[in-house]
Amino acid sequence: MLIAVDHGNKQIKTVHTPPFTSGLIQSDTPGFGTDALAYRGKYYTLTDQRIPYRRDKTEDERFFILTLFAIAHEIEAMGQYSGSLMRVQLAVGLPPAHFGVQAKRFINYFNGRGAVAFQFKGKPYAIFIENTACFPQSFS
């Protein structure tokens, strides 16, 4: 399944779902939101408070977690949810000013993670990112 995610400094954008702010809250306990995502023993919810500007989005896991939200939203929007492992080809977008310097690092940020298990809205997801292609924003 091909999923395109535009990783803006202000918003995350996908093809089939409305954009959402590039911000999240991490907790050790499940939150109250229905759109909670659980990954590696932590719980995440989206927030309208965006992550402070980051020249390098691979410095920590936050943009990976935001990508998991985007992938889950896209799978739901396309009616493709499956309780089994889903193979994903990822097309990602970076701001044009950072594309030349960071494209390879951003591709490596997503590739090579193996099967990624998480829960979204209480449902278990398992994805395997087979390949990642990186484009300047608005082209992914």
PLM feature segments, named:
Residues 1-140:
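Nucleotide/phosphate-binding catalytic cleft detector across ATP-hydrolyzing
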